[in-house]
Amino acid sequence: DTIGSIDDLIENNNTIIIKLENIILNLYRKKSIEWKKQVKIGDLFKCILGGTPSTKKNEYWDGDIAWVNSGEVNKLRIVSPSRYITKDGLENSATKLLPKKTTVIAITGATLGQVSLLEIDSCTNQSVIGILENNTLKHDFIYPMMINAIKKLVLNKTGGAQQHINKNDVETFEIFVPSEIEYFEYSQIVQPIFEYQSKLILQNKELLLLKNKYLQKFFG
């Protein structure tokens, strides 16, 4: 049974992906206890708020530039966009194209406080903030750092009926960061885990495409 075999492969990969995620987060928590330097997120990283091209203009949509809404941030990794926009849509709206491996956070709505990682270059809507890698600290630090910080960040800032945080809340939040040597030692361990996890996540994307092709061919 071809479909069953594909489903088994996807399920096996998902089990490993979740285990690797737990290893990453545990390693981060274990190592970060030793880090003494405290800085604001915005002093180290560029934080970018997304936007939405006007839905009244058809020429802004269905192009070849990936765009994700905050609902996608609910996923462990973002491998596919919600929609596609055009170059005109990108240039005539507040959205920005974020490179893959950008850590993204949902700042309002049902997915408030969710953190994910882009596995594709993509724009986002205005309910999402992207935190870009800098020259020294990469996604293997930023992503687990945000997973660790987000609960406190949200609790500090959400008041009354308006359940949201803003870009300034993220930028002014203080975190502990490793020295260059500490980060090198940490990254040597964690980066290969991220790479293997990413490989499995993208493999699952291909397996799903294969499954859908098979279903269309024989049952379409």
Task: Map each language-model feature to its residues.
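Non-catalytic DNA-recognition/assembly elements of restriction-modification systems
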Residues: 1-52, 62, 67, 176-220
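Low-complexity, Lys/Gly-biased intrinsically disordered segments
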Residues: 36-76, 91-94, 158, 166
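Short amphipathic alpha-helical signal-transduction/dimerization elements
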Residues: 7, 147-150, 154, 194
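Extended hydrophobic-aromatic, low-complexity segments
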Residues: 115-116, 139-141, 153-155, 182-186, ...
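Cytochrome P450 core scaffold surrounding the K-helix E-X-X-R motif
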Residues: 76-82
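A short beta-sheet element
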Residues: 69-70, 86-148, 156-159, 167-168
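Short Gly/aromatic-enriched secondary-structure transition segments
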Residues: 58, 83-84
